[in-house]
Design a protein with these regions (language model features):
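Extracytosolic ligand-binding ectodomains
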Residues: 2-11, 22-372
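N-terminal signal peptide c-region/cleavage motif recognized by signal peptidases
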Residues: 16-20
Length: 372
Protein backbone atom coordinates (compact mmCIF):
# COMPACT_ATOMS: atom_id res chain seq x y z
CA UNK A 1 0.00 0.00 0.00
CA UNK A 2 1.30 3.39 -0.88
CA UNK A 3 0.08 6.69 0.49
CA UNK A 4 1.36 10.14 -0.24
CA UNK A 5 0.21 13.62 0.67
CA UNK A 6 0.22 15.34 -2.68
CA UNK A 7 -1.39 18.73 -2.49
CA UNK A 8 -2.01 21.49 0.01
CA UNK A 9 0.87 20.67 2.34
CA UNK A 10 3.83 23.03 2.54
CA UNK A 11 6.79 22.94 4.88
CA UNK A 12 6.80 25.89 7.29
CA UNK A 13 9.76 27.65 8.83
CA UNK A 14 9.42 25.50 11.90
CA UNK A 15 7.76 22.24 12.87
CA UNK A 16 5.35 24.07 15.13
CA UNK A 17 4.27 26.41 12.37
CA UNK A 18 3.86 23.63 9.82
CA UNK A 19 1.94 21.45 12.27
CA UNK A 20 -0.37 24.35 12.97
CA UNK A 21 -0.90 24.87 9.24
CA UNK A 22 -1.56 21.18 8.64
CA UNK A 23 -4.23 21.19 11.36
CA UNK A 24 -6.25 23.59 9.24
CA UNK A 25 -6.32 21.33 6.18
CA UNK A 26 -9.16 18.98 5.27
CA UNK A 27 -7.59 15.81 3.92
CA UNK A 28 -9.44 13.88 1.24
CA UNK A 29 -8.29 10.81 -0.67
CA UNK A 30 -8.11 9.46 -4.18
CA UNK A 31 -7.85 5.67 -4.30
CA UNK A 32 -7.12 3.50 -7.29
CA UNK A 33 -4.51 1.43 -9.13
CA UNK A 34 -1.41 3.61 -8.83
CA UNK A 35 0.67 0.51 -9.60
CA UNK A 36 -0.03 -2.74 -11.41
CA UNK A 37 -1.68 -3.57 -14.70
CA UNK A 38 -4.29 -0.81 -14.46
CA UNK A 39 -1.89 1.93 -13.33
CA UNK A 40 -2.63 3.98 -16.47
CA UNK A 41 -6.10 4.58 -15.04
CA UNK A 42 -4.64 5.32 -11.61
CA UNK A 43 -2.56 8.07 -13.23
CA UNK A 44 -5.69 9.49 -14.82
CA UNK A 45 -7.45 9.58 -11.45
CA UNK A 46 -4.45 11.09 -9.68
CA UNK A 47 -4.08 13.80 -12.33
CA UNK A 48 -7.75 14.69 -12.07
CA UNK A 49 -7.71 14.77 -8.28
CA UNK A 50 -4.57 16.89 -8.08
CA UNK A 51 -5.97 19.50 -10.44
CA UNK A 52 -9.35 19.59 -8.70
CA UNK A 53 -7.77 20.14 -5.30
CA UNK A 54 -5.40 22.78 -6.66
CA UNK A 55 -8.29 24.67 -8.28
CA UNK A 56 -10.49 24.46 -5.18
CA UNK A 57 -7.65 25.73 -3.00
CA UNK A 58 -6.91 28.56 -5.44
CA UNK A 59 -10.57 29.60 -5.13
CA UNK A 60 -10.37 29.75 -1.33
CA UNK A 61 -10.72 26.14 -0.26
CA UNK A 62 -13.69 24.59 1.53
CA UNK A 63 -15.30 26.00 4.68
CA UNK A 64 -12.37 28.39 5.04
CA UNK A 65 -9.81 25.58 4.95
CA UNK A 66 -7.44 24.25 2.33
CA UNK A 67 -7.73 20.72 0.99
CA UNK A 68 -4.90 18.20 1.20
CA UNK A 69 -4.88 15.15 -1.04
CA UNK A 70 -3.83 11.63 -0.10
CA UNK A 71 -3.30 9.12 -2.92
CA UNK A 72 -3.76 5.45 -2.06
CA UNK A 73 -2.76 2.50 -4.23
CA UNK A 74 -5.09 -0.50 -4.30
CA UNK A 75 -3.54 -2.07 -7.45
CA UNK A 76 -7.13 -3.13 -8.28
CA UNK A 77 -6.82 -5.80 -5.58
CA UNK A 78 -9.99 -6.27 -3.46
CA UNK A 79 -8.12 -7.12 -0.24
CA UNK A 80 -5.78 -4.18 -0.64
CA UNK A 81 -8.74 -1.92 -1.37
CA UNK A 82 -10.48 -3.04 1.81
CA UNK A 83 -7.30 -2.42 3.81
CA UNK A 84 -6.98 1.07 2.33
CA UNK A 85 -10.61 1.80 3.16
CA UNK A 86 -10.07 0.79 6.77
CA UNK A 87 -6.97 3.00 6.96
CA UNK A 88 -8.82 5.97 5.47
CA UNK A 89 -11.67 5.44 7.90
CA UNK A 90 -9.35 5.30 10.91
CA UNK A 91 -7.70 8.52 9.70
CA UNK A 92 -11.09 10.28 9.84
CA UNK A 93 -10.83 11.30 6.19
CA UNK A 94 -14.38 12.35 5.22
CA UNK A 95 -14.28 11.66 1.48
CA UNK A 96 -12.63 9.41 -1.10
CA UNK A 97 -12.74 9.70 -4.88
CA UNK A 98 -12.40 6.06 -5.84
CA UNK A 99 -11.89 3.34 -6.55
CA UNK A 100 -11.35 2.42 -10.21
CA UNK A 101 -12.05 -1.32 -10.41
CA UNK A 102 -15.52 -2.44 -9.34
CA UNK A 103 -13.89 -5.36 -7.55
CA UNK A 104 -12.15 -2.78 -5.34
CA UNK A 105 -14.97 -0.25 -4.97
CA UNK A 106 -17.54 -2.77 -3.78
CA UNK A 107 -15.66 -4.25 -0.78
CA UNK A 108 -14.12 -0.88 0.09
CA UNK A 109 -17.53 0.79 0.20
CA UNK A 110 -18.63 -1.40 3.09
CA UNK A 111 -15.63 -0.37 5.17
CA UNK A 112 -16.22 3.28 4.27
CA UNK A 113 -19.86 3.00 5.35
CA UNK A 114 -18.79 1.61 8.72
CA UNK A 115 -16.33 4.51 9.18
CA UNK A 116 -18.62 7.35 8.03
CA UNK A 117 -16.65 8.02 4.82
CA UNK A 118 -18.40 9.28 1.69
CA UNK A 119 -17.29 7.53 -1.51
CA UNK A 120 -17.80 8.75 -5.07
CA UNK A 121 -16.29 6.54 -7.75
CA UNK A 122 -15.38 8.10 -11.08
CA UNK A 123 -15.12 4.76 -12.84
CA UNK A 124 -16.71 1.68 -11.20
CA UNK A 125 -19.60 0.65 -13.43
CA UNK A 126 -20.82 -2.64 -11.93
CA UNK A 127 -24.49 -2.18 -10.92
CA UNK A 128 -23.91 -3.89 -7.56
CA UNK A 129 -21.94 -0.87 -6.34
CA UNK A 130 -25.14 1.14 -5.90
CA UNK A 131 -27.75 -1.63 -5.93
CA UNK A 132 -26.86 -2.61 -2.34
CA UNK A 133 -28.26 0.81 -1.37
CA UNK A 134 -25.45 1.78 0.99
CA UNK A 135 -25.97 5.33 2.23
CA UNK A 136 -22.43 6.52 1.47
CA UNK A 137 -21.87 5.68 -2.22
CA UNK A 138 -22.33 7.49 -5.50
CA UNK A 139 -20.76 7.49 -8.95
CA UNK A 140 -20.29 10.10 -11.65
CA UNK A 141 -20.10 7.45 -14.40
CA UNK A 142 -22.76 5.14 -15.80
CA UNK A 143 -23.41 1.44 -15.20
CA UNK A 144 -22.62 -1.78 -17.02
CA UNK A 145 -26.28 -2.55 -17.70
CA UNK A 146 -26.49 0.81 -19.48
CA UNK A 147 -23.34 0.48 -21.58
CA UNK A 148 -24.11 -3.17 -22.28
CA UNK A 149 -27.41 -2.03 -23.77
CA UNK A 150 -25.66 0.54 -25.97
CA UNK A 151 -23.10 -2.03 -27.14
CA UNK A 152 -25.82 -4.57 -27.91
CA UNK A 153 -27.86 -2.00 -29.81
CA UNK A 154 -24.83 -1.17 -31.97
CA UNK A 155 -24.10 -4.84 -32.63
CA UNK A 156 -27.72 -5.61 -33.55
CA UNK A 157 -27.87 -2.69 -35.99
CA UNK A 158 -24.45 -3.18 -37.58
CA UNK A 159 -23.79 -6.93 -37.39
CA UNK A 160 -27.20 -8.40 -38.15
CA UNK A 161 -26.88 -12.05 -39.15
CA UNK A 162 -23.17 -12.11 -38.28
CA UNK A 163 -21.35 -14.47 -35.91
CA UNK A 164 -20.82 -12.92 -32.47
CA UNK A 165 -18.52 -14.07 -29.66
CA UNK A 166 -18.36 -12.77 -26.09
CA UNK A 167 -15.26 -13.09 -23.90
CA UNK A 168 -14.70 -12.04 -20.29
CA UNK A 169 -11.82 -11.93 -17.83
CA UNK A 170 -13.78 -13.30 -14.82
CA UNK A 171 -13.38 -10.02 -12.88
CA UNK A 172 -16.30 -8.20 -11.27
CA UNK A 173 -16.07 -5.58 -13.99
CA UNK A 174 -15.34 -7.76 -17.01
CA UNK A 175 -17.74 -10.61 -16.27
CA UNK A 176 -20.45 -8.16 -15.24
CA UNK A 177 -20.12 -6.17 -18.46
CA UNK A 178 -20.05 -9.30 -20.63
CA UNK A 179 -23.14 -10.66 -18.87
CA UNK A 180 -25.06 -7.40 -19.35
CA UNK A 181 -24.12 -7.22 -23.03
CA UNK A 182 -25.11 -10.87 -23.54
CA UNK A 183 -28.42 -10.25 -21.77
CA UNK A 184 -29.21 -7.26 -24.00
CA UNK A 185 -28.20 -9.13 -27.17
CA UNK A 186 -30.27 -12.18 -26.28
CA UNK A 187 -33.28 -10.00 -25.50
CA UNK A 188 -32.91 -8.46 -28.97
CA UNK A 189 -32.98 -11.93 -30.53
CA UNK A 190 -29.24 -12.36 -31.06
CA UNK A 191 -27.58 -15.50 -29.70
CA UNK A 192 -23.81 -15.44 -29.46
CA UNK A 193 -21.96 -18.31 -31.11
CA UNK A 194 -19.30 -18.41 -28.42
CA UNK A 195 -19.13 -17.32 -24.75
CA UNK A 196 -15.75 -17.94 -23.14
CA UNK A 197 -13.63 -16.66 -20.27
CA UNK A 198 -9.93 -16.14 -19.65
CA UNK A 199 -7.88 -15.03 -16.67
CA UNK A 200 -6.87 -11.43 -16.15
CA UNK A 201 -3.13 -11.28 -16.69
CA UNK A 202 -3.08 -13.96 -19.38
CA UNK A 203 -0.66 -13.33 -22.24
CA UNK A 204 -1.26 -16.25 -24.62
CA UNK A 205 -4.67 -16.19 -26.30
CA UNK A 206 -3.87 -18.41 -29.26
CA UNK A 207 -6.33 -21.12 -28.18
CA UNK A 208 -9.16 -18.58 -27.97
CA UNK A 209 -8.11 -16.98 -31.25
CA UNK A 210 -8.03 -20.38 -32.95
CA UNK A 211 -11.60 -21.02 -31.85
CA UNK A 212 -12.67 -17.57 -33.06
CA UNK A 213 -11.19 -18.53 -36.42
CA UNK A 214 -12.94 -21.93 -36.53
CA UNK A 215 -16.29 -20.36 -35.64
CA UNK A 216 -15.91 -17.65 -38.31
CA UNK A 217 -16.55 -14.92 -35.73
CA UNK A 218 -17.26 -11.50 -37.24
CA UNK A 219 -17.27 -9.52 -33.98
CA UNK A 220 -15.85 -10.44 -30.58
CA UNK A 221 -17.05 -8.49 -27.55
CA UNK A 222 -14.49 -8.43 -24.73
CA UNK A 223 -15.57 -7.82 -21.15
CA UNK A 224 -12.22 -6.91 -19.65
CA UNK A 225 -9.33 -4.46 -19.56
CA UNK A 226 -7.22 -2.95 -22.32
CA UNK A 227 -4.05 -5.01 -21.78
CA UNK A 228 -5.65 -8.38 -22.47
CA UNK A 229 -7.95 -6.94 -25.15
CA UNK A 230 -4.89 -5.51 -26.90
CA UNK A 231 -3.14 -8.87 -26.85
CA UNK A 232 -6.24 -10.67 -28.11
CA UNK A 233 -6.49 -8.21 -31.00
CA UNK A 234 -2.81 -8.49 -31.86
CA UNK A 235 -2.91 -12.28 -31.80
CA UNK A 236 -6.06 -12.28 -33.96
CA UNK A 237 -4.24 -10.24 -36.58
CA UNK A 238 -1.19 -12.51 -36.33
CA UNK A 239 -3.46 -15.43 -37.28
CA UNK A 240 -4.97 -13.48 -40.15
CA UNK A 241 -8.35 -12.79 -38.54
CA UNK A 242 -10.12 -9.59 -39.56
CA UNK A 243 -12.65 -10.00 -36.73
CA UNK A 244 -13.78 -6.69 -35.21
CA UNK A 245 -13.12 -6.31 -31.47
CA UNK A 246 -15.51 -4.35 -29.26
CA UNK A 247 -15.22 -3.67 -25.53
CA UNK A 248 -16.31 -1.35 -22.74
CA UNK A 249 -15.02 1.79 -21.06
CA UNK A 250 -11.79 0.19 -19.80
CA UNK A 251 -10.45 0.54 -23.36
CA UNK A 252 -10.27 4.30 -22.91
CA UNK A 253 -6.51 4.65 -22.54
CA UNK A 254 -3.95 5.18 -25.28
CA UNK A 255 -1.84 2.42 -23.76
CA UNK A 256 -4.17 0.12 -25.72
CA UNK A 257 -2.74 1.43 -29.00
CA UNK A 258 0.81 1.01 -27.72
CA UNK A 259 0.03 -2.70 -27.29
CA UNK A 260 -1.67 -3.18 -30.63
CA UNK A 261 0.07 -0.69 -32.91
CA UNK A 262 -1.84 0.03 -36.14
CA UNK A 263 -3.98 -3.07 -35.51
CA UNK A 264 -6.09 -0.89 -33.20
CA UNK A 265 -7.81 0.54 -36.26
CA UNK A 266 -11.51 -0.27 -36.28
CA UNK A 267 -11.70 -1.42 -32.66
CA UNK A 268 -14.88 -0.25 -30.92
CA UNK A 269 -15.65 0.64 -27.30
CA UNK A 270 -18.36 2.33 -25.25
CA UNK A 271 -17.80 5.34 -23.00
CA UNK A 272 -19.58 8.56 -22.07
CA UNK A 273 -19.63 11.44 -24.57
CA UNK A 274 -16.05 12.72 -24.84
CA UNK A 275 -15.56 14.78 -21.64
CA UNK A 276 -12.64 16.74 -23.12
CA UNK A 277 -15.02 18.19 -25.73
CA UNK A 278 -17.60 19.50 -23.28
CA UNK A 279 -17.80 23.31 -23.05
CA UNK A 280 -17.89 22.97 -19.25
CA UNK A 281 -14.47 21.30 -19.35
CA UNK A 282 -12.62 23.64 -21.71
CA UNK A 283 -10.86 25.79 -19.10
CA UNK A 284 -9.71 22.73 -17.16
CA UNK A 285 -8.61 20.89 -20.29
CA UNK A 286 -6.52 23.94 -21.22
CA UNK A 287 -4.83 23.79 -17.80
CA UNK A 288 -3.91 20.16 -18.35
CA UNK A 289 -2.62 20.86 -21.84
CA UNK A 290 -0.41 23.63 -20.45
CA UNK A 291 1.18 20.93 -18.26
CA UNK A 292 1.51 18.59 -21.25
CA UNK A 293 -1.04 16.23 -19.70
CA UNK A 294 -3.81 14.66 -21.77
CA UNK A 295 -6.92 14.57 -19.52
CA UNK A 296 -8.16 11.37 -21.18
CA UNK A 297 -10.38 8.66 -19.82
CA UNK A 298 -11.30 9.11 -16.17
CA UNK A 299 -9.21 12.24 -15.48
CA UNK A 300 -12.17 14.61 -15.73
CA UNK A 301 -14.53 12.13 -14.07
CA UNK A 302 -12.29 12.20 -10.99
CA UNK A 303 -12.17 15.99 -11.15
CA UNK A 304 -15.98 16.03 -11.27
CA UNK A 305 -16.31 13.68 -8.28
CA UNK A 306 -14.30 16.09 -6.14
CA UNK A 307 -16.27 19.05 -7.49
CA UNK A 308 -19.55 17.44 -6.44
CA UNK A 309 -18.28 16.72 -2.94
CA UNK A 310 -16.76 20.18 -2.38
CA UNK A 311 -19.88 22.01 -3.57
CA UNK A 312 -22.10 19.86 -1.36
CA UNK A 313 -19.83 20.46 1.65
CA UNK A 314 -20.16 24.20 1.14
CA UNK A 315 -23.94 23.97 0.83
CA UNK A 316 -24.28 21.67 3.86
CA UNK A 317 -21.72 23.74 5.79
CA UNK A 318 -20.14 20.56 7.13
CA UNK A 319 -17.91 17.66 6.07
CA UNK A 320 -20.12 15.15 7.91
CA UNK A 321 -20.47 12.37 5.34
CA UNK A 322 -24.14 11.59 5.93
CA UNK A 323 -25.23 15.21 5.77
CA UNK A 324 -23.11 15.81 2.68
CA UNK A 325 -24.53 12.75 0.92
CA UNK A 326 -28.09 13.87 1.68
CA UNK A 327 -27.18 17.22 0.17
CA UNK A 328 -25.64 15.60 -2.92
CA UNK A 329 -28.76 13.55 -3.63
CA UNK A 330 -31.04 16.55 -3.12
CA UNK A 331 -29.30 18.85 -5.58
CA UNK A 332 -27.74 19.36 -8.98
CA UNK A 333 -24.06 20.19 -9.31
CA UNK A 334 -22.05 22.13 -11.86
CA UNK A 335 -19.07 20.06 -12.96
CA UNK A 336 -16.62 19.67 -15.82
CA UNK A 337 -18.99 16.97 -17.10
CA UNK A 338 -21.94 19.35 -17.02
CA UNK A 339 -24.78 19.41 -14.49
CA UNK A 340 -25.00 16.20 -12.46
CA UNK A 341 -27.88 15.01 -10.31
CA UNK A 342 -28.13 11.74 -8.38
CA UNK A 343 -30.93 9.31 -7.58
CA UNK A 344 -31.58 7.76 -4.18
CA UNK A 345 -29.07 4.96 -4.83
CA UNK A 346 -26.27 7.32 -5.85
CA UNK A 347 -26.42 6.77 -9.62
CA UNK A 348 -26.30 9.78 -11.90
CA UNK A 349 -29.58 10.71 -13.56
CA UNK A 350 -27.92 11.81 -16.80
CA UNK A 351 -26.93 8.55 -18.54
CA UNK A 352 -25.44 8.75 -22.01
CA UNK A 353 -23.08 6.11 -23.44
CA UNK A 354 -21.82 6.30 -27.00
CA UNK A 355 -19.64 4.14 -29.25
CA UNK A 356 -16.05 5.07 -30.14
CA UNK A 357 -13.70 3.74 -32.80
CA UNK A 358 -9.90 3.54 -32.69
CA UNK A 359 -7.85 4.62 -35.70
CA UNK A 360 -4.50 3.37 -37.02
CA UNK A 361 -2.62 6.36 -35.56
CA UNK A 362 -3.44 5.55 -31.94
CA UNK A 363 -6.36 7.94 -31.55
CA UNK A 364 -10.08 7.35 -31.15
CA UNK A 365 -13.24 9.26 -31.92
CA UNK A 366 -16.91 9.12 -31.07
CA UNK A 367 -18.68 7.63 -34.08
CA UNK A 368 -20.18 10.43 -36.11
CA UNK A 369 -17.71 13.01 -34.75
CA UNK A 370 -14.24 14.25 -35.60
CA UNK A 371 -11.18 12.52 -34.13
CA UNK A 372 -9.88 13.16 -30.62
Amino acid sequence: MKSLKLIGLALGASFALSASAFAQDITIAVAGPMTGSESAFGRQMKNGAEQAVADINAAGGVLGKKLALEADDDACDPKQARSIAEKIGSSKIPFVAGHFCSSSSIPASEAYADSNVLQITPASTNPLFTERKLWNVARVCGRDDQQGLVAADYIVKNFKGKNIAILNDKTTYGKGLADETKKALNKAGVTEKMFESYNKGDKDFNAIVSRLKRENIDLVYVGGYHQEAGLILRQMRDQGLKTILMAGDAMNDKEFASITGPAAEGTLFTFGPEPRNKPTAKAIVDKFKAKNIDPEGYTLYTYAAIQVWSQAVKKANTTDAKKVMDTIKAGEWDTVLGKLGFDAKGDIKQIDYVVYKWDAKGGYAELGSKGS
